[in-house]
Amino acid sequence: MEFVTLTEEEFREFSMKHPMANFMQTTDLGDLKSNNGIKIDYVGVKEKGKLLCATLLEEEPSILGKKVFYAPRGFLIDYHNKELLKFFTDNLKTYIKKRKGFKLTIDPNLVYQVRGADGSIMPKSQKDDESFKNLCDLGFEHFGFNLYLEARQVRFAYRMMLDEPYDVKKQEFSKSTRKNLESTYKKGLSVRKGVEKDLPIMEDLFKDTATRKDFFYRKLDYYKEMYKYMKDLMTIYFAYLDPKKYLECAKENLKEEQEKNKEIVNKMEKDMIGAKLKSQKEASDKRLIKLENELKEAEEFKKNYPEGKDIACLLSMWNGEEFLTLTSGSLEKYRKFTPKYAMYDAHIKDAYKNGYKACNFYGISGNFEKENNPLYGVYEFKRGFGGNVIEYIGEFTLPITKFNKFYNFLRGIKRMIKK
C-alpha cells in the first residue's frame, strides 16, 4: 500500500462514488473553502494503482505558527478494515506533523445505529462498535455521545428511506402532516426552484428566521460563493404565493363552506335540531367568518403583491445516496400557510425522481422528550414525514504531537478566566 496526495480529478472521481459519499467530502466544497483562504489537501491510499480510501483535509492556522487539521465528514474508508485504517492513520500523522499540525479532527459520515421514529433503540438495531473500537485503538479520542449541537456536525438526524413508491410512503406521513399538506395546497401555495438571481431572496428569508430565533446566519456573499462552487450539488426551493391562485383558492374555499352551511340550514329546517346538528352549524359559521377574512386578505395580497411573493425557502444538497435538507427560512407573517410542508414534499418527490435511496432531513437533537426541549419542534416536524432517527458515530480527535496537550491546557485556562 502507498500513501499518496491526490489531484482534484482523482479525488472527485473516487468521492462521488464512495458508499460514504457526502457533500462535505467533495472538491466542490474544497474549492469553496480554498476561495475563503483555507488550505485544502486531498490524500489517500493506493494499492497497485487502485485507490482504496481518501479524504479531504482542511488546514486551519492555530497559535504559535501551528496548525490543526479537519476532515469534515471524513474519511471515505471502510472503518472495519483495521489494516487499511491503521496504515492511513499512521501516514496521516506523519503527513500532518510535517506541516506543523498538532491534531486531526474527524466526524465520519458513519451511522452508529438506527433508532426508532421515537428515538428509542430498536431490539434488532446493532451499534457499529467495531468501527468505534478501531478508531479508539489507533489513538482517536471520542468527543462523546453528545445529544445536542456541541460538536462541529450534527450527531442525530432524521432519515426517510425511499424503499417504497411515493404514494405508499405518503400513507406513512402523520395525520397532521397530511392535513397540513392538503391545507397548504388549498391556500394557493406552490413550490418553485430557485436560480442564481434568487439568492438575495433566499438570504432575506434565512435572515428573517435567524433573527427571529436568534440563530447565526450567513451573508449574501457566502451564498453567492456557495452557488458558484456548489451549484451542481444544490437545489433551492421557494414556497411561492401566487396572487391569482391565492384569490381563486380563497373564493373556492369560501364557496364550498357556504354550500355546506346551506345544507346544514336545510337539515335544521326539516328535522329536529339536535345537539350534533347545532354543533355543526356553529363550527361552520366560525369557518365562514374565517374564510371571509381570508378572502379579504387574498384581495389585499393581490393588491400589494401583483407579481406574487416567495414566503419560504429550503436549501437541499446532494449527499451521496441521500438527498439532504440543509437549511430553511420563512417569513413569520405567512406562517399560517405552513410553507415548509410543501417544500419538503417537493424535496421528497425530487429524491424519488433522481434515484436517491433516502431523504436525510438532517439535524435534530438526541433528546426526544418534549418537556423543556426547545429543539423538540424540529424533531416533531421531521418525524411527521415518516422514517427513523439515525445516530452518527460522532466526533473524534487524533493528537499528533505533544503540543496538543499544551494547547488544551491553554484553552482550559482561557475558559476559567471567562468564568
Residue locations for each model-derived region?
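Alpha-helical structural motif
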Residues: T7-E10, F88, K127, S131, ...
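C-terminal catalytic domain of photolyase/cryptochrome flavoproteins
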Residues: R12, Y42, K302-K303, I364-K419
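Short secondary-structure boundary/hinge segments and terminal tails
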Residues: V114, R152-Q153, M202, E369, ...
